[in-house]
């Protein structure tokens, strides 16, 4: 096989599931699809597992396939230069405060899109005296119980954090720039029952078809709703008939969870 090296800035494998340990952290794609096709796990405890179980799964894969011998932990790549003459890459990294330069033939970037937390530029933020942290840097100690807490943003992480901490806070306020759509998913907090686990483990090809069933509705099945119909009359908030039906489905699912009319206007997107 090919010789390869993995440069990992953290001191352990797991990637996003190593870094994101905030309350309520869990996957938002069904486990039986959000996993390696060559390393199926038929014993997930939940359809959308929480961070500890996901980290355990990826760590076991890391050990089983003997990836550690190819990995340099606590090593951050700071510069890449391509040499046109010999068609190779110069990789500059930092490990234990030392700069290391190496030549390689191929570079594959797997840094992800969300590995560098970005704080909003808020006037006066430097004078704030309370605890302030990004969701990916959630402290180990409890710093929110009985406190007034502000959550900036209402995206995927906020969907998970807010319900998990609301009852512990003295007061919880969400600051939102624009509302996002929330996909209705009745199985989001459900356990995988024993019957499903048995079928996945024992019925030939069932796990493969089940994986496809989880994949298709969130991909190719949605294509018709993504094309702009030039003759569609409701162009202010939808782009075709299928898209409008999906918007209505999402809207009704959100309305079913909200009873405050003033809040409804704040959480239903206008796009």
Predicted regions and their residues:
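A short, basic/flexible loop-to-alpha-helix module at the beginning of a structural domain
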Residues: 133-146
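N-terminal FAD-binding dinucleotide-binding subdomain shared by FAD-dependent oxidases/monooxygenases
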Residues: 2-125, 141, 154, 159, ...
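Active-site acidic short loop of glycosyltransferases
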Residues: 103-105, 130, 146
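Short coil/turn connectors at secondary-structure junctions
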Residues: 146-147, 170
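Extended hydrophobic/aromatic segments used for targeting, binding, or gating
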Residues: 126-134
């Amino acid at each position: 096989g090919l010789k390869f090296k993995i440069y990992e800035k953290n001191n352990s494998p797991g990637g996003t599931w190593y870094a994101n340990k905030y309350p309520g952290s869990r996957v938002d794609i069904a486990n039986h699809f959000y996993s390696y096709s060559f390393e199926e796990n038929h014993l997930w405890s939940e359809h959308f597992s929480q961070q500890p179980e996901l980290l355990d799964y990826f760590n076991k894969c890391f050990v089983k396939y003997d990836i550690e011998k190819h990995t340099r932990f606590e090593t951050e790549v700071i510069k890449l230069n391509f040499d046109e003459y010999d068609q190779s890459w110069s990789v500059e990294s930092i490990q234990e405060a030392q700069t290391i330069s190496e030549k390689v033939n191929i570079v594959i970037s797997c840094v992800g899109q969300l590995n560098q937390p970005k704080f909003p530029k808020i006037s006066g933020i430097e004078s704030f005296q309370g605890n302030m942290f990004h969701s990916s840097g959630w402290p180990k100690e409890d710093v929110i119980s009985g406190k007034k807490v502000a959550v900036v943003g209402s995206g995927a992480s906020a969907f998970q954090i807010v319900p998990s901490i609301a009852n512990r806070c003295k007061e919880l306020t969400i600051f939102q720039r624009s509302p996002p759509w929330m996909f209705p998913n009745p199985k989001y907090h459900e356990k995988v029952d024993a019957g499903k686990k048995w079928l996945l483990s024992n019925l030939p090809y069932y796990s493969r078809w089940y994986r496809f069933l989880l994949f298709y509705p969130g991909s190719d099945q949605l294509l018709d709703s993504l094309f702009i119909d030039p003759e569609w009359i409701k162009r202010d908030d939808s782009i075709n008939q299928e898209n409008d039906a999906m918007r209505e489905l999402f809207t009704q699912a959100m309305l079913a969870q909200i009873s405050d009319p003033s809040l409804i206007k704040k959480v239903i997107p206008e796009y």
